[in-house]
Structure formats: C-alpha cells, structure tokens
Design a protein with these regions (language model features):
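Active-site-proximal loop and beta-strand segments within enzyme catalytic domains
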Residues: 202-226, 248, 256-259
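Mid-domain, small-residue-enriched loop/turn segments at the edges of structured enzyme/sensor domains
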Residues: 235-298
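Active-site-proximal beta-strand/loop segments in catalytic clefts of secreted hydrolases
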Residues: 172-174, 222-227, 234-238, 266-269, ...
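Soluble periplasmic/extracytoplasmic beta-strand elements of cell-envelope proteins
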Residues: 66, 111, 168-172, 196, ...
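Active-site SXXK
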Residues: 177, 186-210, 221-222, 359
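Short, conserved catalytic-motif segment at the N-terminal edge
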Residues: 164-186
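Extracellular adhesion/carbohydrate-binding repeat motifs centered on closely spaced tryptophans
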Residues: 2-134
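Structured C-terminal helix/loop/strand segments within mature extracytoplasmic catalytic/sensor domains
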Residues: 15, 23-28, 39-40, 132-157, ...
C-alpha cells in the first residue's frame, strides 16, 4: 500500500485537531472522501490508499496475465470472449506452441498462436486418415523469407488465372489471422452443406433438443464417405420427423453463427429419403465455409468433446483428390469436399507444423478442377513452410 500526500480543507477548534472535509489525490485532483487518514498536521494529511484489485488483461515485462473479478490470476484453460486461452501455473498466457491440455480427463492436442488463441487439433493420425498412402515424407523446408499476405494473394491469383471457369478461394493464416478472400460468391455447395448439418446436430444435442445416440450412426458416414441418405435422414431428425423443418432449423443456426450465405432447401441425391420444398437450391460460399472451420478450430461451435469429434470426422474424409493431394503424407487435414454437375469444392484446416491455416476453394466449370486444387494447395503449403513471421 502506498502513501499519498494530500491537501485538505480544515478548520481548527480548541482542543481539536484538523477537521477534514475531503482529500485530494492523483493527477486530476479528484476528491476522494473515503480515504482514511493515518497522520494529520495543520494543513497536510498522510493517508493510505486502499490497494486496488487487478482485473482483466495485464502485461508485465512482456508477459500477458488475466485477473478474475476477485483479483486472482487466471490459470489453466479459460474462455475469454469467444476464444479459449491457456495460462501456466504462474498465470503467464502461453503463446506460439503446441500443447496437450486435459479437458474432463481427456487429453486434447492444441496449437496456441502468437495472440495466445488456442486452436484444436484432430487426434486422428494422418496415417489413419490416409490409408495406403505411400508418398514419401519430404525433408523439412528451410524458412528463408518473411511472410507477406500480399505475396500469398498474388500467388493464388496467378494459379487461378491458369484455369477457366469460376473459382472462389478463402485463406486464413491461423497464427496471424491474416485472411484472403478472392471472388467470393454464393454457389451450389453440393455436399459442403453437410458441414452445417453436422454442427446444427451437435448444437441441438447440447441444448437437449435431440437424442445423440439415436442419430450418431448417421454423422460418420455423412462426413467421411459423404453419404447422402445419412444427410437426408439427419435432416429429418433435426426437424422431429420433418426434413423441411430440419432445413429451417439448419438455416436459423447458420444465420446465428454468421454463415449468412449458407442455406438448405432440399435433400441430396442419389440417396433415400430425398426431400424438397420448392424451387430454391441449397447454397453456400467459400467465405462461409472458411469462417465455419475457423469457428470449429477455435472451439466456438460446440463443447470440447464434440469439437474434437467433429475434427476427427473431417480428418477422415475419404476424398483426397483435391487440396489433400497437394500436401505431404504426414500433414493433417480436417476437411470436407463436395461434387455435383460442374461443381467441385474442398476446404478445411491444414495442420502444417507450427503454421496451421485454413483454405477453401469453390469451383464451377473449372477444367481439371482437381489439378487446380492440388496446385493451389501445394503452393500454400510450401509458402507457409518457407516463410518467417
């Protein structure tokens, strides 16, 4: 506790000392009547200022701490705003590292970026996700230049220019949160709509509106093998037996989490239990899917066990002809693809060592669309692994 010299307004009386009207302190000379005097003289009083409790973010010697409403340092896993952070036993916020954190007795691998934001990593090994993949693991790349988001954009634009048709690309470097959005437009999403179906299901499970065990058998095939019947039946479950009501609830959920270019209006074929309610087509965009995977990565769509479950399903997606084809065999990729007519889309989280990022590409009428996605993916991975932040 620090002493403060303050001037007072006083009067004198026989047998009495100074009578204090109020105290002044600080650069603004604020009147603070609640301070208590510990010594008095004719015109000066020495008082003690009550020690103030720290609250919120504090930076000391370059280290970040957070204090709760009781003035205590936060430790362990904490949600601040809409993102998770992790604080060591001494209260220091951890940054820029991989860690394994235990949630309710379950060890969960995570990556912490330069801002201390914690992102979740799939626990499915790449070897398990890529059964039979015999590509040699390349040697480590040398980091020899500074990261520049404008360079990334120019590289993407150069690749896009070599292919015809319509392409939309979204990119986010998860360590810096620097983003690129090129040619974003609503498109028919094909099976990418299943991302929203999965998260709507988990959301309704957590709010107690649907029985997880009753529909659990649908979500794996829907994501891993893109089974349309499972999607159609899950939508029916989301609507308490009415698939169109399920679609309405999906749309409400998408709007609530900011996916305002995404909506479902019908089922998917080929598959049983197809449904439709009019002439509108399902719709989404590269930006929406990119933001979806960002929220999933940061644990903003579901609780920790369900977040981990969804990431593990996406890591096992069996279509690896697009973006996955441009990645080394040992690099994790949690994603979803969609294909129908002239459309082919792919997007998700690339777990490049120390430099995770999100990439989503929507294509319409692009010849050699898989070659485009593979080239795009190879370029982004190589850039991430050879640049310094």
């Amino acid at each position: 506790m620090r002493n403060i010299i303050i001037f007072i307004v006083f009067c004198c009386a026989v047998g009495c000392g100074a009578v204090f009207s109020f105290y002044y302190y600080g650069d603004d000379w604020l009147a603070v009547p609640e301070l208590s005097a510990t010594d008095d003289a004719d015109d000066v009083a020495v008082v003690q200022q009550p020690e103030k409790k720290l609250y919120g973010k504090q930076v000391v010697d370059g280290e970040t701490y957070y204090y709760d409403s009781n003035g205590e340092k936060m430790t362990g896993i904490q949600m601040i705003g809409e993102k998770y952070y992790y604080f060591a036993a001494d209260g220091v916020m951890l940054k820029n590292r991989r860690v394994t954190i235990t949630f309710d007795g379950i060890p969960v691998p995570c990556f912490i970026n330069d801002e201390g934001e914690l992102g979740f990593i799939t626990t499915v090994s790449q070897e398990a996700a890529v059964s039979g993949h015999d590509e040699a693991v390349p040697p480590a790349l040398e980091r020899n230049k500074d990261f520049n988001i404008n360079d990334v954009q120019r590289g993407i634009e150069t690749i896009m220019a070599r292919y015809g048709g319509k392409t939309a690309v979204y990119f986010n470097d998860l360590k810096t949160n620097q983003q690129i959005s090129l040619n974003n437009m609503p498109m028919y999403p094909c099976c990418m709509i299943k991302t929203a179906a999965l998260s709507t299901f988990m959301h309704r499970v957590e709010e107690g509106s649907i029985d997880y065990a009753q529909y659990q058998s649908y979500i794996g095939p829907m994501i891993i093998y893109s089974d349309n019947t499972c999607y159609n039946r899950l939508m029916k479950g989301l609507g308490d037996g009415d698939a169109l009501l399920g679609a309405k609830r999906l749309n409400e959920y998408c709007n609530a989490i900011g996916m305002r270019e995404t909506a479902a209006y019908h089922g998917l074929r080929p598959g049983a239990d197809y449904f439709t309610g009019g002439n509108s087509s399902n719709v989404s965009s590269a930006n929406d899917i990119g933001h979806y995977f960002e929220k999933l990565y940061y644990g903003q769509l579901a609780n920790v066990p369900h977040t981990q479950e969804m990431l593990n399903l996406y890591a096992q997606c069996d279509d690896r002809e697009g973006i996955a084809g441009g990645l080394p065999a040992n690099v994790g990729y949690a994603h979803k693809t969609g294909e129908a007519y002239a459309f082919y889309h792919d997007g998700g989280i690339v777990y490049a060592e120390g430099r995770p990022y999100i990439v989503v590409a929507f294509t319409d009428g692009v010849q050699n669309n898989r070659a485009f996605l593979k080239e795009l993916s190879s370029y982004l991975y190589h850039y991430q692994m050879t640049t310094i932040l």
